[in-house]
């Protein structure tokens, strides 16, 4: 796998997609940058990043065995790896805020954006992208955002941080499940581990639906397909949502 550090770049994910468009990428790659100027998250949200303070990281995996039906496994594997990696640095109170954020307490410290490329209804390649807030201290009216430095009161060497990340990717065999028949993966254990780290699980939260309506309920679980199950307040039945239908109000 080739590893490339980029200087100032709009988005490491977008850079990879441009290479794909031009058919100039034909093997697995890692691209990373400390100066991403136009990072994006799910639903087109912008990831605000000061130069040389944070890490933008994208992995390109060609010809994976993950299929469309089980593609949420990509998110599960990525989220659990990042939790494990940040735990190495003793970041406290880590959890996964469905569908694509990593939290420390009630503060977002990492966003994930995984993208698939299709060919004849099959996944031809995967871009696994995430950004970790490391040394940034100002988040411009983003009250729920934070960084490792703000949380631990420590300054981090970005180069060393990235070296440890890449080393752990290899040591933990992170890439293996993407090239393994998904039917042979222990999906029950994966989703159980994911739910054990689910942000505000079993707690009453407020949610905004895609039609603008607000409702309140307890987060129960996420299933292997990425569906969030919520028990509505004062009711015993579950309501199920995909990531485009609902947003948690922190």
Regions found by a protein language model. Give the residues of each.
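N-terminal lobe of the biotin/lipoate ligase/transferase fold
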Residues: 1-89, 110, 117
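Long, positively charged amphipathic alpha-helical accessory segments at protein N-termini or as interdomain linkers
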Residues: 5, 64-69, 73-94, 104-250
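Conserved active-site carboxylates
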Residues: 101
């Amino acid at each position: 796998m080739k590893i490339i550090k980029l200087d100032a770049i709009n988005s490491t994910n977008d850079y990879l997609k441009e290479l794909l468009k031009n058919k100039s990428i034909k093997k697995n790659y890692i691209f990373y940058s400390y100066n991403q100027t136009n990072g994006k998250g799910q639903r087109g949200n912008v990831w605000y990043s000061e130069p040389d303070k944070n890490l933008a990281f994208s992995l390109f995996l060609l010809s994976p065995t993950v299929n469309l039906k089980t593609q949420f496994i990509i998110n599960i594997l990525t989220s659990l790896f990042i939790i494990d990696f940040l735990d190495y640095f003793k970041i406290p109170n880590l959890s996964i805020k469905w569908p694509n954020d990593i939290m420390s307490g009630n503060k977002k410290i990492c966003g994930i954006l995984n993208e698939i490329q299709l060919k004849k209804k099959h996944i031809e390649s995967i871009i696994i992208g995430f950004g970790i807030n490391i040394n940034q201290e100002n988040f411009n009216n983003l009250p729920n955002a934070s960084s490792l430095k703000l949380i631990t009161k420590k300054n981090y060497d970005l180069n060393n941080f990235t070296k440890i990340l890449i080393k752990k990717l290899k040591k933990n065999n992170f890439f293996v499940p993407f090239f393994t028949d998904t039917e042979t993966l222990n999906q029950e254990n994966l989703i159980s581990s994911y739910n054990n780290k689910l942000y505000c699980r079993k707690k009453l939260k407020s949610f905004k639906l895609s039609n603008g309506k607000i409702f309140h309920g307890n987060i129960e679980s996420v299933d292997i397909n990425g569906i969030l199950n919520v028990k509505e307040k004062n009711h015993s039945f579950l309501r199920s949502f995909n990531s485009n239908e609902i947003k948690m109000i922190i």
